[in-house]
C-alpha cells in the first residue's frame, strides 16, 4: 500500500483542527489519549501540508528510513512547538518511531517483529496482542486504535504478495518478507475483530548444538539421528502445534551430504537448508476466481520427475501423505516430513487417515503395509508444561504383525519432577533396543560404536 493512502486512512476521524488540549493530570489513560491525539495530528498535517519533495520521499517504492524519519520529525516538531505541554519532550522520539513503523513496517507490531526473543505474535482484535517468549504466552502492552487500524496492517501484509481478504474470503495464509508465517482471519468468522497470527521465522538457522544446549535432545540422540540421515533412513517428525517440528526438520536437513539434490515442498517456505543443490517449491492457493490452486500433492508428484535424491515435505496434512509414502517406497530413501500427532502411535494413525483422504479405496491393511515399509523412524517432538520443547521419543517403525504396525522405542525422555523455578526436570535414556535397519548403516558406510545401543548405565554412565 502507498504510504499516502495509509496516512489518509489512519488520519480519518481526526478532530477538525490540530489543537491538542493540555490536561493537568491525571491518569495513564489521559496521558495516552494526549499521545494518540498528537500522533493523529501529525498524520493529518503530513497529509495536508507535505511538499512535493516530501511526498516523493514518503511515496517512494524503496523508502529510505532516515529520510522518512527526518520528514516525520519535522512535522512532529511543528506540532509540539504549537502545543509544548501536550506530551513530554521525551515522547518525541516515540512518536517519530511509531509513525515510521506505520509507514515502513507493520504499525504497532513492528517492534515485536524486531524483538529476537519473541517467537510468535497473536493479534486478537485491536486491543489484545499476545506474544510467545521463551515458550510462554503473555499479553503485550501493544494495541491498535480500532478494527480499521488492524485491517490497514492486514492490507499492508497482503498487498505485496497479491493476496486478498474480505467478507467473502475471510481467512488467508501468507508470508512476510523475512519468511515468517502469517494466518489472518476476520469478521464475520472472527467475532473479536480481525485476528493475525505470526509465527516468526528464525533469521539464523539453529544447529544441533543449539538444540543440545536448549535441552531438546542429548548428544547420543543427536549422533544417532545424524547417522540415520547419512544412512538414508526415512524419518517422520511428529508433534503438536508449536512443538518445534519445523526447527527440528531444519536441523535434520543439515546432516544431508552436500552432493545430493534436495527438493523441499511447503505451504509457506520456512526451511533454511544450507546445501548448495536445493530446489524450494511452495504451494499456491486459488485466486479470487477460485482457480489456479497448486497443492502440496501436486508438488510431490512433480518432485518425483525432478530427479531428487531426497524429498523434504514441510508437513503432510491430507492426501499428499500417499504420494510421500510412495516416494519413500520407490527409491527416494532418506526423505523427511512432519505431521501433527501427540505420540508415535498417533502419528501412524494420522497417516492412515491422510492416505484415505487421497480418494482411493484401499484396504486398511494395504495402507498400513505402505506406512510400515516407508516410514522407518519417528521423532516425537513435544512442548512441555514449562514451555520447553523436547524430543520425547525416538521410535523405530518395524513391520506388520497381523493387522498391526509394530514399533519399538529407542530413546525417550523420562520426566522426574519440577524444580523451584517451575522448570521440568528429567533425562534422556537409551532403551537398549537396537533398530532393525542397521543393515542400511553398513550399506551406506555409517558406523556407530558397538555398545552404542546399550542402556546408559551399562555403557558406563549417561552419554552427554
Locate the predicted segments by residue.
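N-terminal anchoring/assembly modules that precede and organize ATP-driven motor systems
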Residues: 1-138
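Active-site phosphate-binding and catalytic loops of NTP-dependent enzymes
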Residues: 55-56, 82-88, 104-115, 157-174, ...
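Conserved glycine(s) of the Walker
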Residues: 244
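Switch/coupling sub-region of P-loop NTPases
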Residues: 222, 226, 231-238, 247, ...
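NTP-binding/hydrolysis catalytic cores, primarily Walker-type P-loop NTPases
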Residues: 387-464
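P-loop NTP-binding catalytic core
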Residues: 115, 123, 128-231
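AAA+ ATPase "lid" subdomain C-terminal helix
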Residues: 183, 377-387, 400
Amino acid at each position: 500500500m502507498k504510504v499516502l493512502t495509509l496516512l489518509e486512512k489512519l488520519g480519518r476521524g481526526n478532530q477538525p483542527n490540530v489543537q491538542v488540549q493540555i490536561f493537568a493530570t491525571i491518569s495513564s489513560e489521559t496521558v495516552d489519549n494526549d499521545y494518540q491525539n498528537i500522533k493523529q495530528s501529525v498524520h493529518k498535517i503530513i497529509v495536508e501540508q507535505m511538499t512535493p519533495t516530501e511526498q516523493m520521499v514518503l511515496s517512494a517504492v524503496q523508502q529510505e528510513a532516515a529520510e522518512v524519519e527526518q520528514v516525520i520529525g519535522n512535522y512532529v516538531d511543528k506540532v509540539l512547538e504549537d502545543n509544548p505541554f501536550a506530551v513530554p519532550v521525551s515522547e518525541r522520539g516515540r512518536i517519530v518511531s511509531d509513525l515510521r513503523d506505520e509507514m515502513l513496517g507493520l504499525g504497532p507490531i513492528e517492534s515485536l517483529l524486531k524483538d529476537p526473543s519473541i517467537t510468535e505474535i497473536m493479534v486478537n482484535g485491536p486491543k489484545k496482542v499476545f506474544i510467545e517468549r521463551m515458550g510462554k504466552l503473555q499479553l503485550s502492552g501493544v494495541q491498535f486504535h480500532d478494527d480499521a487500524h488492524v485491517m490497514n496492517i492486514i492490507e499492508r501484509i497482503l498487498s505485496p504478495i497479491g493476496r486478498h481478504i474480505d467478507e467473502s474470503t475471510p481467512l488467508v495464509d501468507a508470508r512476510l518478507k523475512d519468511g515468517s508465517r502469517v494466518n489472518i482471519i476476520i469478521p464475520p468468522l472472527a467475532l473479536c475483530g480481525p485476528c493475525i497470527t505470526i509465527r516468526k521465522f528464525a533469521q539464523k538457522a539453529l544447529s544441533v548444538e543449539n538444540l543440545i544446549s536448549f535441552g531438546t535432545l542429548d548428544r547420543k540422540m543427536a549422533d544417532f539421528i545424524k547417522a540415520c540421515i547419512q544412512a538414508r533412513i526415512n524419518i517422520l517428525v511428529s508433534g503438536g502445534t508449536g512443538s518445534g517440528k519445523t526447527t527440528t526438520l531444519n536441523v535434520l536437513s543439515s546432516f544431508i551430504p552436500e552432493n545430493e539434490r534436495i527438493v523441499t515442498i511447503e505451504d509457506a517456505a520456512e526451511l533454511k537448508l544450507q546445501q548448495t543443490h536445493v530446489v524450494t517449491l511452495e504451494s499456491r492457493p486459488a485466486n479470487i476466481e477460485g482457480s489456479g490452486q497448486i497443492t502440496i500433492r501436486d508438488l510431490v508428484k512433480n518432485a518425483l520427475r525432478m530427479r531428487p535424491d531426497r524429498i523434504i515435505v514441510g508437513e503432510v496434512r491430507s492426501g499428499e501423505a500417499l504420494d510421500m509414502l510412495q516416494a519413500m517406497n520407490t527409491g527416494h530413501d532418506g526423505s523427511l516430513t512432519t505431521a501433527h500427532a501427540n505420540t508415535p502411535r498417533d502419528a501412524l494413525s494420522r497417516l492412515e487417515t491422510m492416505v484415505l483422504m487421497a480418494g482411493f479405496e484401499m484396504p486398511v491393511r494395504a495402507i498400513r503395509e505402505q506406512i510400515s515399509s516407508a516410514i522407518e523412524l519417528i521423532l516425537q517432538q513435544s512442548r512441555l508444561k514449562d514451555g520447553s520443547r523436547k524430543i520425547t521419543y525416538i521410535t523405530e517403525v518395524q513391520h506388520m504383525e497381523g493387522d498391526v504396525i509394530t514399533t519399538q522405542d529407542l530413546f525417550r525422555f523420562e520426566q522426574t519432577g519440577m524444580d523451584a523455578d517451575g522448570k521440568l526436570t528429567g533425562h534422556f535414556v537409551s532403551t537398549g533396543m537396537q533398530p532393525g535397519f542397521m543393515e542400511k548403516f553398513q550399506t551406506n558406510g555409517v558406523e556407530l560404536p558397538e555398545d552404542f545401543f546399550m542402556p546408559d548405565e551399562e555403557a558406563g554412565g549417561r552419554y552427554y
